[in-house]
Amino acid sequence: MESGKTTIAKIIKRNEPGGRVPIWLMRQAGRSLPEYRKAVENMNNFMEICYNTDLVTELTLQPVTRFDMDAAIIFSDILIIADVLGCDVNFVRGVGPIIKPVESPKELKGPQEIETKTLPILNAIKKVRSQLPKEKSLIGFAGGPWTVASYIIEGGSSKTFSKVLNFYPSCLKEIIERITEVTIIYLIKQIEFGADVIQLFDSNAGALSEPLFKEYVIEPTKRIILAIKDRFSDFPIIGFPRSAGNLYKDYCEQTGVSAVSIDYNVPIKWAKANLNIPLQGNLDPNLLAYNKTEAIKEAKRIIDCFRDLPFIFNLGHGVLPDTPVENIAALVNLVKSY
């Protein structure tokens, strides 16, 4: 689909408000929905779900059908890239991803098999786009190279990032370069198969000091965006360097992202004053899950602050699994009517 014809893509490309504030939520498809739990009840392997074209199509469309979201985001995971590179990726219920730690860039496969390996996901993108109303965006995505690298070196999620931050700098840089190369190919394929917006999730960006943030987040992101825009000149790309703090400003100014998603720790007045591109965010998902009254109150405050800007309503991170569906419905109804 030609980018720019959907509501969210228009807001990003025109860099101006689009009337009603649109809404979609990170992790809007997933465990918070009873229809999701039913659809995957006989599936024991999360990666098998991600490579099942028909199931991915169904899961991607579920929140759009239930809540009338303004965008669908393809149901997948940022560790697809790790799997493509030959890492042993498993998801353990209640724990998260468990990966055999990578100790050298020589352990990683090349990009030759990426289209073949990810074809079930790409075909799901094509199917979703064909079933999605034309005014609704289809968001493709990948993890930021730093974040994917931290997962495969740490062997999963981490609170300290002690292994990756003490990794040989030259080896870490090569691993990030390899991930960047594959990510470029993967995202371009997602666009070719029908995604009309892309989001880069650098979930672990906040673990880095300013010099390392520039080397491991800004530079790889810039390379990805230049490669995409060399093929698709004004394609809308949202960056999400979670917990970057004041470095959000450098990220917006130096990477070339079309828009930025801000986490819930970013003061909205600071964001409005310092981030001069379309904004997305930033309701605390804990409020949405556990305090509907406060969530609605805070959502109104966010909209009041940003409604005169090009703005997309979202959370400051993903929907929590135990978020009541009635809370999500109330939020969507509020944003669409406020």
Curated annotation (Swiss-Prot):
Entry's Gene Ontology cellular component terms: cytosol
Residues binding substrate: R27, Q28, A29, G30, R31, D77, Y151, S203, H317
GO biological process, one term: protoporphyrinogen IX biosynthetic process
GO molecular-function term, one example from the UniProt record: uroporphyrinogen decarboxylase activity
Main subcellular location of this protein, as a coarse class: cytoplasm
Site, as annotated: Transition state stabilizer: D77
The EC number(s) this enzyme carries: 4.1.1.37
Disulfide cysteine pairs (residue numbers): none
Pfam families: URO-D (PF01208)
CDD domains cross-referenced by the UniProt entry: URO-D
Entry keyword Hydrolase: no
Catalytic reactions on record: uroporphyrinogen III + 4 H(+) = coproporphyrinogen III + 4 CO2
Subcellular location: Cytoplasm
Annotated keywords: Cytoplasm, Decarboxylase, Lyase, Porphyrin biosynthesis
Pathway assignment: Porphyrin-containing compound metabolism; protoporphyrin-IX biosynthesis; coproporphyrinogen-III from 5-aminolevulinate: step 4/4
NCBIfam families in alphabetical order: hemE (TIGR01464)
Assembly notes: Homodimer.
Primary role: Catalyzes the decarboxylation of four acetate groups of uroporphyrinogen-III to yield coproporphyrinogen-III.
Similarity section: Belongs to the uroporphyrinogen decarboxylase family.
Protein name: Uroporphyrinogen decarboxylase
